[in-house]
């Protein structure tokens, strides 16, 4: 059925069933398949990737490039009505270009995420990001590329929790009271480890240790 596009402050797109999507940075043009990369730009990007791979190879580092699909590529059914000019879009083309013209490892887990959404909500309704379950599925694709033992998402326990206000609510200057039913998950895939506290940059564990994510060039 026809659902007209409605954009708030040039940045937030209202979708079906109250879903929100990011409208900035040419996201809508990408969704419609319009902003295809030229051969010259693809060649330039690949050249930079090869340069980085060469540096990593000399240091004995295994390099993996991973592209995370935009939310609208996974939850297209909640998007407003748009005419799709090309279903073979820029990321699909670029991933194929890299694979056909180099030995660089590149991961684009769009099929894995589309399969996972049959069982869980894997992106936030009111935020641009994937949730913990989406990230878990994506990481398994990375593990596969690195030959690290994988965990089938269907075999893990996941506790559903409420998600607080998403970034799209703030970007669109929307009333948060109308967008308060989002979903996240606490994924329990290593029962021997219990999370005692999660304070942003440090997660306490019951064995006395802690998990600290690295950000940018910060050493850990």
Tell what function each PLM region has.
Residues 1-220:
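Extracellular glycan-modifying ectodomains
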């Amino acid at each position: 059925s026809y659902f007209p596009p409605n954009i708030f402050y040039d940045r937030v797109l209202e979708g079906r069933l109250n879903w929100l999507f990011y409208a900035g940075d040419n996201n809508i043009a990408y969704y419609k398949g319009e902003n295809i990369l030229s051969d010259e730009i693809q060649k330039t990007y690949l050249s930079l990737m090869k340069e980085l791979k060469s540096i990593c190879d000399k240091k004995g580092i295994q390099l993996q490039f991973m592209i995370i699909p935009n939310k609208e590529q996974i939850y297209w059914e909640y998007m407003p009505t748009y005419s799709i000019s090309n279903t073979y879009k820029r990321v699909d083309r670029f991933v194929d270009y890299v694979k056909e013209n180099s030995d660089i490892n590149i991961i684009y887990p769009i099929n894995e995420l589309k399969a996972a959404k049959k069982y869980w909500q894997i992106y936030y309704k009111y935020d641009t990001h994937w949730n913990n379950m989406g990230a878990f599925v994506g990481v398994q694709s990375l593990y596969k590329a690195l030959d690290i033992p994988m965990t089938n998402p269907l075999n893990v326990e996941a506790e559903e929790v409420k998600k607080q206000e998403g970034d799209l609510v703030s970007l669109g200057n929307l009333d948060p009271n109308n967008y308060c039913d989002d979903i996240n998950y606490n994924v329990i895939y290593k029962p021997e480890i219990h999370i005692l506290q999660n304070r942003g940059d440090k997660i306490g564990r019951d064995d006395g240790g802690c998990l600290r994510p690295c950000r940018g060039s910060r050493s850990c």
